[in-house]
Amino acid sequence: PVRALRNKDLEVTASALKGNTQKGFLDLIQPVRLKQNEADINAGTTRWNLADQRFTSSARFQGKRQDATATGNGFVIDEATTTVIIPKACRLSQPGESLTARRCSWNWLTNRVVADGDVVLRRREPDQETRAPRMEGQLGSSEGVRFGSSGQRVRSSIRFTPDQPGSATPSSRSPVSF
């Protein structure tokens, strides 16, 4: 195995290296692990473009940060713009909600998350599904990812569970207003 420390906090592990530093790239041979602070990515063969400060892979991967996970077909880590891009089959999940989209990006300095293409956001409480062509959100340290649509139409459905025996009577419930 090959292990390298990039900058002061990015640890790179691979089974082997191929490439040409004069041409400015190294291929990290699978399995590949990129670990930085609280984030961890497990991937297949990944190209490290030294001049562009980019890691790219077309292989399926899984990433984890605190309680959130991300999977997709390929990724681009652009150190210059502090952005991770999942170009295909993006799936983000955290306790209580999950999001799927054709493409996603996350800026780890601003914590801005953008999902594009057939976006579906599912929440467990309440049982809610929201669909939109694009959603944007913030990755918050205590509240997880909060998504919204930027001025575009969305379609949501919410399912309510019927009252269970022994639950509050209708007269003792708080009124609902919109």
Region roles according to the model:
Residues P1-F178:
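Mature-chain termini and adjacent capping regions
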